[in-house]
Regions:
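Non-globular, low-confidence helical/coil segments that flank catalytic cores
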Residues: 1-306
């Protein structure tokens, strides 16, 4: 156990629907350190309710702010109407990095909007870096993100397994894609990251399936994690039993829409998580899921929606 008491409490806030209208890129060769004032020793992970998609905001020590993916297949203008307003509500005026796990629309549609708004001067929010998986072939959506970043004067970084990015005391290790990844199967070659902050460990798995989970188990000595962003919105073909037996997540968050037609999350995946003794939070039932971390404990806040 990394914490004597990892999840201090699960707080439920009821909302009725009718009321809701060093960047040290390790690369084993070079590194740049992003320096800044340490306002307070904390980490805040917000898994936003973007419908059938992913959008996660990380706030690190009151100084660094990151977006991991940002898109939806069933909500239009999710960047304009959900992600940007959320950032403003948190007083965030700068994103130090936007991490894109892969280029499916349900992970990038909102990010495209944000970059377009930045490029046109339609938002006061600034973006420093766009971090993409290092693929040998760059699909159309990948090239579009590059172009939007260039117009917005946002630096593009490409990362692969073995790279490390540090923000203050938070360390992001890139576990996937492996060197030489082509980019043909964007799900299985998606960016996978492990976040370490003090004793806390979180795993962000994009849309990988069991095939890549097995490769990760072979390539790394994966250990227990406190937080797991469940891959592919809870698909039956991800989050396998063998993988869960290794990473043993204390908390798992599934981002999906209540009206999705894919059967997400699958009963099989939910059963595997339950058998692993994992606390499950689902954005289709809870809305946004907020995880607050300090050096000793992890607090979770979720919203029960009628």
């Amino acid at each position: 156990m990394m914490y004597e008491k990892r999840i201090e409490r699960i707080q439920r806030v009821r909302i009725r629907r009718w009321k809701l209208p060093m960047l040290c890129v390790g690369m084993l060769g070079f590194g740049i350190w992003l320096l800044g004032y340490r306002a307070r020793p904390n980490l805040r992970i917000a898994c936003l309710d973007v419908g059938q998609g992913d959008g996660i905001v990380l706030e690190i020590e009151g100084t660094w702010n990151l977006l991991i993916d940002g898109g939806s297949s069933n909500k239009s203008a999710v960047g304009q109407y959900q992600i940007l307003p959320y950032l403003k509500s948190r007083g965030i005026s700068r994103l130090d990095g936007i991490f894109i796990s892969h280029t499916d629309g349900d992970h990038i549609s909102g990010t495209e909007e944000i970059l377009e708004y930045v490029g046109k001067g339609l938002t006061s929010i600034r973006v420093d870096h766009l971090i993409l998986p290092d693929w040998e072939e760059e699909p159309e959506n990948y090239l579009k993100l590059r172009e939007l970043a260039q117009t917005a004067d946002v630096q593009v970084l490409q990362v692969k397994a073995g790279d490390r990015i540090c923000y203050g005391n938070a360390q992001l290790d890139i576990l996937w894609p492996e060197k030489g990844a082509v980019g043909e199967d964007v799900n299985e070659e998606a960016m996978v990251m492990e976040l370490e902050y003090g004793k806390f460990k979180g795993l962000f798995t994009g849309d990988i399936g069991m095939e890549t989970e097995k490769k990760l188990q072979s390539a790394y000595r994966l250990e227990d994690v406190d937080f797991l962003k469940v891959a592919h919105h809870g698909s039956r073909y991800s989050t396998g039993e063998e993988f869960l037996n290794v990473v043993k997540p204390e908390l798992a968050v599934i981002s999906c829409s209540a009206s999705n037609t894919y059967g997400h999350p699958s009963p099989e995946t939910l059963r595997r998580l339950e058998n692993a003794g994992t606390e499950i939070c689902r954005t289709d039932r809870s809305g946004a899921v907020i995880v607050k971390v300090d050096e000793e404990k992890m607090k979770v806040q979720r919203f029960v929606i009628d």
